Amino acid sequence: MAASAWCCLRCCRDGGTGHIPLKEMPAVQLDTQHMGTDVVIVKNGRRICGTGGCLASAPLHQNKSYFEFKIQSTGIWGIGVATQKVNLNQIPLGRDMHSLVMRNDGALYHNNEEKNRLPANSLPQEGDVVGITYDHVELNVYLNGKNMHCPASGIRGTVYPVVYVDDSAILDCQFSEFYHTPPPGFEKILFEQQIF
């Protein structure tokens, strides 16, 4: 009994709590290790400008993921999902089997094939927020919180959120603290946790 009391007093005296600190999970952001050579990432990994593409820092492991991009400045851009094999210097993306993206003209491309298209009167403009849902089969697009009902599919393997810009486009990413509530069942990207 005295030994237990002494341990508690020693921990308090040393300023410790006696607990092992938990590591905080890193925030998902744009990954400067997986970006095109002429891409510029600023705002703590949340804003992309320059020319080229960039992957997010975490893959989409969970069943239903949601993320958003806000168009700060128009130009040429695209958002969606891609594997780590995608060439982030060769834009527009969607030209090969390693990316599935919606381009600034509203067309969704995978493997150089147009898979779907936003209605002509619903193209994203400067200031708009584009949400993406992905469930390992289908990618869906939301414009300012509204489902655009233009699904696309076909990509295989481990995918990451991807964005590309050119011609003065600037986009901000939101991987948490969203502008719009994710659709039911979809949530922010979760880092895979390993328990040993």
Swiss-Prot record:
Record's keyword annotation contains Acetylation: yes
Family matches, as SUPFAM superfamilies: Concanavalin A-like lectins/glucanases
Positions bearing N-acetylalanine: 2
Keyword match Nucleus: no
Domain B30.2/SPRY: 2-184
Gene3D superfamilies xref list: 2.60.120.920
InterPro entries: B30.2/SPRY, B30.2/SPRY_sf, ConA-like_dom_sf, SPRY_dom, SPRYD7
A UniProt-annotated Pfam family: SPRY
Alphabetically ordered keywords of this record: Acetylation
Membrane-spanning intervals of the chain: none
Protein known as: SPRY domain-containing protein 7
Organism: Mus musculus
Gene name in the database record: Spryd7
